[in-house]
């Protein structure tokens, strides 16, 4: 077991995990100090906000003959590569063990780590003997705090090869020591091949086991998702060629978040390509973790030759927080589901569809038959861009992961599709189909369309009226799902084809109501009269007289009460009325004609005599026949006058000596007197209360006298102040304390007020208060 240096041990916490070697030759050397980091040019930040699926291209680095400096290059995808290089000697057969410099690594915020092994290019394929001793990889921490992780290769990890030329170099089992300084789970992937170039065509691969034991940290946060992307450019048999063929790695990554799951096994299969160097292709593995995924499918991007050999190794990992399975094997056939873009000319890229279900939360890559229209979905709070495809297929699709075929069932039309968990607006569809719930999300770029394989594109419109369409929904393009307003409940929807609908109205709001929503008791005939007369309902409610019922006179005759009183018809029951402002000319002509016939036609019916109230009489007389002129509809009795000689009434009892009239009039007078007395009593009481509480107006008189506060004039106030000052001077001369002086002044002020009130009472002794 390796001995950790004191410098490194002082930096590590107590709960650091312990690793044990499974080698036959346990190394005795201790860890060397971490090497110095390379210049800042080797650090290239990873670009995570890309509009397509991230693809990783391998990188080959050309090494100098004797130089020990590692030069790292990156591809156009701006990925961060950690490239440990080994120094190879071409002049001597026995090379001294050297410790190459490892460029430092900075992990981006999305916790991606890419380790790329670079093949060394020697001058002579048969003149180099390689010794690898004391290599150490300094990897930045995958946690947020950025604590380092040490991947150390001890000095005696293999025996130096002594063969020359085409001799075989057999590597010994490798011991890798991983040290982490954080309480987060870290995945370490190691390969069985040597980390440096070998000049021999035959390489013996060995299996090595890495045991990692770690105490689970006490944390309340959710599981941390780490993305690990490994790209390798393996050695080639011909070292004189400038490039090498990278292997195709296909795999399936399943993340288990349960802390009590059994240990899982990591199997890594490598492929050394034997095709010529001019047919170099790129190996890309895209791993895009969800926010909290439980299944993740890794799909190979490039194809490979069927005759290439395969090497595998097993690394059991025991992680306390959760076990992860990484199975990377070689597949002889091309995977039908491919993602990303490739630089190879023989590869065919197929668009994929991503369907995310929040309950089980798995991500499946499904190939499509035809390239459809692609819609970009902006998910708030996510670092990745998702692409939504609007055309679906009915057949089942296969995803090849590690040589096994997984057949996914066909997408059902009634399957709920979740596009954004934050928006939960359920829109029920009521056609003669299977009901489904669609979660719409307003987009500014394209419309959201619910499509199935059997039905064409449909537009969902409500069958019932909506109270109001929201202004932010009016800017959506055609084909957008309209949700009902809050409080309307479950309403029916009519599904119409999209070609029949041109666009959604663009005003700020559109109110869709029915006639049942109007809450008014006004009949339609009265509404027509209101529109003709131009009067409001509030004015009609305050109307004091009876409405007219004219039907043929157009309200232009004297028997129309409105016309006879010189008023316009207001809220009347008349038909074809001309007694309004709209027919002012016809009305003026009718008035002139009536005045020509009777100059006093428009005078009041009850006129005054010359000598007083007793001479009041009706101008035309009444025409009562059955009431005896003792009802209110008799104009003479209503006006409290007796019928005169001009009246044409029959059985009249409204005369001076009539006992019936006297009885009725006495009762009416008694009632009127009683009402007047009650009104006077209420008025007197209210006036007295207001006088006692407020006394705001001095205009109230009491029989010519004055109220007490009217005597407080300017002179009286000055005299009162003089009395108060005199009392203060006397208290000062007698050396009275301050409290006693204040008391004397207040007593003097009370005596002054008492004098004012008594003087006012003497002035109005003969005039009692009758206010």
UniProtKB/Swiss-Prot annotation:
What ranges does the record give for the region DNA-binding, renumbered to this chain?
A: 546-559, 622-635
Positions bound to Zn(2+) 4: 622, 624, 629, 634
Marked site positions, Interaction with DNA: 597
All copies of domain CRC, residue ranges: 544-657
Q: Which residues bind Zn(2+) 5?
A: 622, 636, 643, 647
User: PROSITE patterns recorded for this chain?
Assistant: CRC (PS51634)
Give GO terms: molecular function aspect only: DNA binding; metal ion binding
What are its GO cellular component terms?
A: nucleus
List, alphabetically, the Pfam families matched.
Answer: TCR
Q: What is this protein called?
A: Protein lin-54 homolog
Q: What is the lineage of its organism?
A: Eukaryota, Metazoa, Chordata, Craniata, Vertebrata
